UniProtKB/Swiss-Prot annotation:
Gene: gatB
First-tier enzyme category under EC: ligase
Catalytic activity: L-glutamyl-tRNA(Gln) + L-glutamine + ATP + H2O = L-glutaminyl-tRNA(Gln) + L-glutamate + ADP + phosphate + H(+); L-aspartyl-tRNA(Asn) + L-glutamine + ATP + H2O = L-asparaginyl-tRNA(Asn) + L-glutamate + ADP + phosphate + 2 H(+)
Protein name in UniProt: Aspartyl/glutamyl-tRNA(Asn/Gln) amidotransferase subunit B
Family membership noted in the UniProt record: Belongs to the GatB/GatE family. GatB subfamily.
Record's function text: Allows the formation of correctly charged Asn-tRNA(Asn) or Gln-tRNA(Gln) through the transamidation of misacylated Asp-tRNA(Asn) or Glu-tRNA(Gln) in organisms which lack either or both of asparaginyl-tRNA or glutaminyl-tRNA synthetases. The reaction takes place in the presence of glutamine and ATP through an activated phospho-Asp-tRNA(Asn) or phospho-Glu-tRNA(Gln).
Length: 477
């Protein structure tokens, strides 16, 4: 029997605010334990939460970007459960009336086919604290710095049908929240993580199978591995006549397996009710319009524009718009390079990306500015230097800094374009290799490349390749 996986993701994006969702405590990552938790975060008697307006703006911004309905009236609720790192005994979230509903994104599959993924809702909530196990023996430490950190939980429909689709969708949301500037997307720090709901059913059947939830997966690779393991596990259970249990499971990357955590709860288990300390959130049209004005050019629109405006391939445009920082860098290079779009794309995706990857750096950390790279590309385009020499200039620029023109002048790298000078170089090479000249004129055409190489070697790579080819052909004819 052929089985079909049915997958939905609940992505938790930590919103990039300086203070928490209901208190003024800081949200900076890496502070010593329990130094960024105030009385509100600790749930001490007599304190009242106050909603951070920046959080609301970010949620609305996301909703507009996915063409969703923005609720003008939404409500915060208490989600009641006991856990050591939840000091109040409840989590403030949104349940029946979320701030964002009925949106969608379009993902592109490997075969180029586009697929629409529904986003059922996106709601605001506070994060819990963190349990620490590594530095303790026989006990668990609690760090409440993260308690009260604002989260946007983004819930997809059960629209994903493979591990690849799930990862593609997750990357799409990751790119989007970073473009919008509402989340830094740092998965190592837990700023962007997901829970995955997965069931399998016979191919062609509409009824959903029993689902399991995989908790707190914080890398694209782990999402793919966890889902693949769970598909295989559920398939084995059903084909052996067993029954899949509705439960919450944890993915163990070291063992590459999922293991049970607890029986999956239903919403009723959390006893949701409106938080009496928080008024309903009411948004005016003017507020939503104000947020709409701050929307940047979104990834899909930017990618299409790059194809049309810069005549790039769909692949190149996709790579260059993978992050807002990279797209901005590329456009600044093109501007400096007087519109040399394709050549700029080749250098940004090739030599620059290679150098950055080698050192584990991002485009934001590039020691070569877009203006420096753009000037170098101008010198290739106007044939001041050859592409080969440009690599030498780039290496110097990357390691030591400096402008392309200064490096070219200092190292004497300007391309030889004077016809007489190139002819002199050719004559020297031909005179030094009479046997090869005779063989070439006798029909051994492959020796042409040998002569080109010898002239380039003699000129230290500075002879203009096009002129060299033309003059050499005349000399050998």
């Amino acid at each position: 029997m052929q089985w079909e996986p049915v997958i939905g993701l609940e992505i938790h994006a930590q919103l990039a605010t300086k203070s928490k969702i209901f208190s003024g405590a800081a949200t900076a990552y890496g502070a010593p334990p329990n130094t960024q938790a105030c009385a509100v975060d600790l749930g001490l008697p007599g304190v009242l939460p106050v909603l951070n307006q920046a959080v609301v703006r970010m949620a609305v911004k996301f909703g507009l970007a996915i063409e969703a309905k923005i609720a003008k009236h939404s409500v915060f609720a208490r989600k009641n459960y006991f856990y050591p790192d939840l000091p109040k005994g409840y989590q403030i979230s949104q349940y029946e009336l979320p701030i964002v509903a009925d949106g969608h994104v379009i993902i592109e599959l490997e075969d180029g086919v586009e697929k629409r993924i529904e986003i059922v809702r996106a709601h605001l909530e506070e994060d819990a604290g963190k349990s620490l196990h590594e530095d303790f023996h026989g006990m668990t430490g609690i760090d409440l710095n993260r308690a009260g950190t604002p989260l946007l939980e983004i819930v997809s429909g059960p629209d994903l049908r493979s591990t690849k689709e799930a990862v593609t969708y997750m990357k799409k949301i990751h790119t989007l929240v970073r473009y919008l500037g509402i989340c830094d997307g740092n998965m190592q720090e837990g700023s962007f993580r997901c829970d995955a709901n997965i069931s399998i059913r016979p191919q062609g059947q509409e009824t959903l199978g029993t689902r399991t939830e995989l908790k707190n997966i914080n890398s694209f690779r782990f999402v793919e591995r966890a889902l693949q393991y769970e598909i295989e596990r559920q398939t084995e259970v059903l084909e052996s006549g067993g029954q899949v249990l509705q439960e919450t499971r944890l993915f163990d990357p070291a063992k590459n397996e999922t293991r049970p955590m607890r029986t999956k709860e239903e919403a009723t288990d959390y006893r949701y009710f409106p938080d009496p300390d928080l008024l309903p959130l009411v948004l005016e049209d003017s507020f939503i319009d104000e947020v709409r004005e701050t929307l940047p050019e979104l990834p899909d629109a930017k990618r299409k524009r790059f194809v049309m405006e810069y005549a790039l391939s769909a692949y190149d445009a996709s790579v260059l718009t993978a992050s807002r920082e990279l797209a901005d860098y590329y456009e600044a290079v093109v501007k400096t390079a007087d519109g040399e779009a394709k050549l700029s794309a080749n250098w940004v995706m090739g030599d620059l990306a290679g150098a950055l990857n080698k050192e584990g750096k991002s485009i934001a950390d590039s020691p070569v500015s877009p203006e420096q790279l753009g000037q170098l590309i101008k010198r290739i385009a106007d044939e001041t230097i050859s592409g080969k020499i440009a690599k030498t200039v780039f290496e110097t620029m990357y390691a030591q800094g400096g402008k392309a023109d200064e490096i070219i002048a200092r190292q004497g790298l300007k391309q030889v374009t004077d016809t007489a000078s190139i002819e002199k170089l050719i004559d020297e090479v031909l005179a030094a290799n009479p046997q090869q000249v005779t063989q070439y004129q006798g029909g051994k055409d492959k020796l042409f490349g040998f002569f080109v190489g010898q002239v380039m070697k003699t000129s230290k790579g500075k002879a203009n390749p096009q002129q060299l080819n033309e003059l050499l052909k005349k000399k050998l004819s």
